[in-house]
Amino acid sequence: MNTFQMRDKLKERLSHLDVDFKFNREEETLRIYRTDNNKGITIKLNAIVAKYEDKKEKIVDEIVYYVDEAIAQMADKTLESISSSQIMPVIRATSFDKKTKQGVPFIYDEHTAETAVYYAVDLGKSYRLIDESMLEDLKLTEQQIREMSLFNVRKLSNSYTTDEVKGNIFYFINSNDGYDASRILNTAFLNEIEAQCQGEMLVAVPHQDVLIIADIRNKTGYDVMAHLTMEFFTKGLVPITSLSFGYKQGHLEPIFILGKNNKQKRDPNVIQRLEANRRKFNKDK
């Protein structure tokens, strides 16, 4: 299966929708958008092709379902009936678009040197990112949206599974409600886990649908964490960052874990992008 075959397969599976398709050969993406208002989504075909080797038709079914729901929710509709409980935060990479396809700025805030917080209206099986044009219909200010979203993310269940590898404890939050990564904003939850940690606590949001927390008790733990974050990052439908964050008393610090058997786990010169982002972030705070 290559990107051209996947493009054709998806177009065939989505032929029941009133949409148009735009294929970008260079970026290997397929944009699917409504014919009535030009709203749509862009999917990365190369990522889907990579998953197809393991998941076969299951990954195609997942993408078709996701597109079906997203396109349906993009129909023009009133926002006046939206309740405060439907306002949620979502985590995105700092490279994520700052404006809609129509050029309207999204409502977002810087979070770390690697992540940003966007805000969304929860629509049940999908959500819509909030942009400036929606504020009047929602009858909310940007500050109210921030406060509501943080309140709502704290109400989410924080169930997790754990795994022990070579004496290190790993926690996985993977409820698939669209807000797993958003739980990194729940400081009370992170502090609860921190109180249980015997070693250094690391946190990672490799993609939208997972939050990984690690209690690193020996050097092997850093290597395992680096492997986990990269693996999840490459497999996520909405990737965020392959870097981990050190967590201590409510503060998140992006770190770079060096290769196996390297004694140092932090090196401010190892990647210029991280350092540049950190300087910019600290300057703007």
Curated annotation (Swiss-Prot):
It comes from the Bacteria. It holds the Pfam family DUF1444. Belongs to the UPF0354 family. This is UPF0354 protein SAOUHSC_01859. It comes from Staphylococcus aureus (strain NCTC 8325 / PS 47).
